[in-house]
From Swiss-Prot:
One GO cellular component term: nucleus
Compartment(s) of residence: Nucleus; Chromosome, Centromere, Kinetochore
Biological source species: Neurospora crassa (strain ATCC 24698 / 74-OR23-1A / CBS 708.71 / DSM 1257 / FGSC 987)
Lineage, highest ranks first: Eukaryota, Fungi, Dikarya, Ascomycota, Pezizomycotina
UniProt-recorded name of the protein: Probable kinetochore protein ndc80
Family: Belongs to the NDC80/HEC1 family.
Protein encoded by which gene: kpr-1
Length: 743
């Protein structure tokens, strides 16, 4: 990039431009307080092929802001405050307030300053439009779908609500929300907040985005236009009635809104701290020039706004000259870094070229390399042949090793047999010397002596343990005595008993001291090898203090340097009596002071009671006001909720009614069709039943005739059989009667 400066004329020549031709569909919101005035620095000279780079504000103006106009066409052509010439302003349709579209174009071009942002008055590319520079903002707003967009975030999920609520609370605590707003959030804020919590939170978060904005209306009237200006993607799903009654089922929606505003504020803070510069550099986008131009426009625009309306072009040039010079110096500093990098790269390039030349010179002839390659190929073939031969030898040696291992196993067996033979011979030799009884007797004697040694060792260990315990107890008692003596000396020093020159000592030395040995090794020699509970030897300097000499210990009267029951006790009794007398005098004085203090307290208490009575009356009035306000708000919220619920139920009933009518009509048609089908089926079934009935009657009649004939035949058969049987019986009776007569 390069920088030209000649008599106040400046331009920026670069292959890309990020500040001109800003598309108004960008998704980066800007605070409404920044949308105050418009200005465009026009062409400075005819020799430049580009216009000055500028930056448009990317947000909507506040709807409640009025439109002020100031027109002045007096001034030089070097600094123009109207729209850039040869600009296709139809590509930038302003998001102005109502009534702003009726302003004539000529008056807009003549305006020097305006307190309302008009996008069509300040494009930064000459004769180009949004795409004239070939580089647009990468924060493009996606086309909005028709209808109410659906929020893809799982706002109904409890875990997601807890997570974003915790992030919101951490952000509030980090940025001193309660101190700035003088409001403490409810304990259960993330699950069931109050309306006041939401109001303060929304105002505080919006002030983080736009510090200059002032809330003047109710929250349900302020929020919707602000959400449109911020381009909140799901603002259509939020109604005024929901804003006036935050909580319950719709709290997840507002929690997502507050979290989105928090992220937007964090993004703006990161942008102000140049937090995304590294990411742009990694993406291959150089924004150093953009930052320099933006800083220039910000500072120069502010000074230009602060100037008087009647200021001439010379004053304007004089006011802008320091900013132009500062921008030129910034570009020179930026270019110096690139020049330094270029010099380093050029040096590196020269070094690499030199190395390439040296490598080309030092590289041997390709013919020699080919010859070496052929030799290495031949060596490779020879090595492969040698490797094959070595593998064959390896197999041969492995077979030989196996044979040697078998022979080694046989030698081990022979060695074991020789060892067994040696043991047998040794046993035979032993049997010739000592008898078994002598061996048993010696073994028994050795075991008895071993048991005696173990018993004596055990008794010795027990005695050592008891001695160690008594020694440890004595050491603990001595340490406790030293602590008590130290505590006594500390207390005596505090009450003025020691040293002898103290107030209450009266020339007597009342300081206690423990008089024991410090280092004579009398007792340590008897405890060598005895271990204490911690595994350390008990003999040592610490235990030598317990004995006066090698055989005797200390008497109780010899351990301390003073007679406690005689001298010290009498001194303490006398001091106690003296202190009691002084205490009695002090108590009398204190009682008089207490009486005076009680009278003062009674007077203060009377005044405090009067103040509390007035405070109770004030609090009662405040509570009555709050109750009335809460009841009114609750009634309003309940009525709004009831109205919304009834509207939903009415719409639902209408939808259900239309669906029921269509369903009944469909059922009527289906019933008629089914009735006709059943009628046809009934007629066919009736004919079928008549035919079947006639057939069955014919079959019954035929069966009846058959039965009748069968019965007649059976009767005839029965009659014949009866007659036949009767005839046989008569014949038999006659035969029987004949023999009887003969007899």
């Amino acid at each position: 990039m390069s920088q030209d400066s000649n008599a106040g004329l400046w331009s920026v020549r670069r292959p890309r431009e990020t500040l001109h031709g800003v598309n108004l569909t960008s998704g980066i919101p800007a605070p409404p307080s920044t949308l105050k005035r418009q200005s465009t620095i026009g062409t400075i000279g005819t020799g430049h092929g580009r216009s000055l780079s500028g930056r448009q504000s990317l947000a909507l103006p506040r709807p409640s802001q009025p439109l002020f106009q100031r027109s002045s066409d007096i001034g030089l052509g070097s600094v123009k405050r109207a729209s850039v010439h040869n600009m296709n302003t139809s590509q930038f349709k302003p998001y102005g307030t109502p009534g702003s579209s009726g302003i004539p174009r000529s008056s807009q071009e003549l305006d020097r300053r305006s307190s309302v942002y008009r996008p069509s008055a300040r494009p930064s590319a000459v004769g180009g439009g949004p795409l004239a520079g070939g580089h647009m903002s990468f924060f493009q707003q996606a086309p909005q779908p028709a209808g109410v967009p659906r929020d893809p975030r799982p706002l109904k999920d409890r875990q997601f609500q807890n997570r974003i609520g915790q992030e919101l609370l951490e952000y509030l605590a980090k940025n001193n929300f309660e101190m700035e707003m003088n409001h403490k959030l409810s304990d259960n804020f993330t699950k069931s907040p109050t309306q006041k919590d939401f109001n303060y939170l929304f105002q505080w978060l919006y002030h983080r985005i736009d510090p200059s904005y002032r809330f003047q209306k109710n929250i349900d009237q302020e929020v919707p236009p602000l959400l449109k200006q911020l381009r909140y993607p799901y603002e259509k799903s939020i109604t005024k009635s929901q804003i006036a009654a935050v909580g319950g089922q719709n709290w997840s929606t507002f929690l997502g809104l507050l979290h989105w505003m928090m992220q937007l504020a964090q993004m703006l803070e990161g942008y102000a701290r140049h937090q995304y510069d590294d990411a742009c550099m990694e993406a291959g986008v150089d924004i150093a020039g953009d930052q320099i131009i933006f800083d220039f426009l910000t500072s120069a625009y502010q000074d230009w706004l602060n100037m008087d309306d009647e200021a001439g072009d010379e004053d304007v040039e004089r006011a802008l000259q320091p900013h132009v010079q500062g921008m030129a110096e910034a570009f020179e500093r930026s270019n110096a870094k690139y020049i330094q990098e270029l010099e380093i790269l050029e040096g590196e390039n020269a070094r690499l070229l030199k190395e390439i030349q040296e490598l080309e010179k030092s590289t041997p002839d390709p013919a020699i390399l080919d010859n070496h390659f052929k030799i290495m190929e031949e060596d490779k073939i020879k090595f492969e042949e040698y490797n094959t031969l070595a593998m064959q030898r390896t197999e041969k040696y492995e077979n030989r090793i196996q044979v040697l291992r078998e022979e080694l196993g046989k030698l081990h067996v022979e060695l074991k047999e020789a060892e067994e033979e040696r043991r047998q011979m040794q046993k035979a030799v032993d049997d010739q010397g000592i008898s078994m009884q002598d061996i048993d007797r010696m073994t028994s004697e050795r075991e008895r002596l071993q048991r005696s040694i173990e018993s004596a060792s055990q008794r010795l260990e027990d005695v050592k343990k008891k001695v160690a315990e008594r020694e440890m107890e004595a050491s603990q008692r001595l340490d406790e005595l030293e602590r008590l003596v130290e505590k006594y000396n500390t207390v005596a020093y505090q009450i003025g008993l020691i040293p002898a020159t103290a107030v209450n000592a009266k020339g007597k030395n009342l300081e206690l001291q423990v008089t024991v040995n410090e280092g004579t090794p009398n007792f340590a020699s008897s405890m060598q090898g005895v271990l204490g509970p911690n595994g350390q030897p008990l003999g040592g300097v610490e235990n030598e203090r317990l004995l006066a000499d090698s055989t005797t210990g200390y008497q109780p009267a010899h351990i301390l340097n003073l007679d406690l029951r005689g001298q010290v006790k009498n001194t303490f009794l006398a001091l106690r009596k003296e202190v009691s007398e002084r205490r009695k005098v002090a108590m009398d004085v204190m009682m008089e002071d207490h009486d005076l203090l009680d009278r003062a307290k009674e007077a203060i208490e009377d005044k405090r009671n009067e103040v509390e009575a007035l405070g109770h009356r004030v609090r009662a009035a405040e509570e009555e006001y709050e109750k009335t306000k809460e009841v009114t708000n609750a009634q309003k919220m309940a009525s709004d909720a009831q109205i919304e619920k009834m509207e939903k139920e009415l719409a639902k009933m209408r939808a259900q009614l239309s669906e029921s009518v269509q369903l009944m009509e469909q059922r009527e048609m289906n019933t008629n069709i089914e009735y006709e089908q059943l009628t046809l089926r009934a007629n066919a079934l009736r004919e079928e039943l008549h035919t079947e009935t006639m057939r069955m009657l014919n079959d019954v009649i035929k069966f009846k005739m058959h039965v009748q004939r069968s019965l007649e035949e059976y009767e005839t058969f029965v009659a014949d059989e009866l007659e036949q049987e009767l005839g046989i019986d008569d014949q038999e009776m006659e035969d029987e009667d004949t023999p009887m007569a003969d007899v």
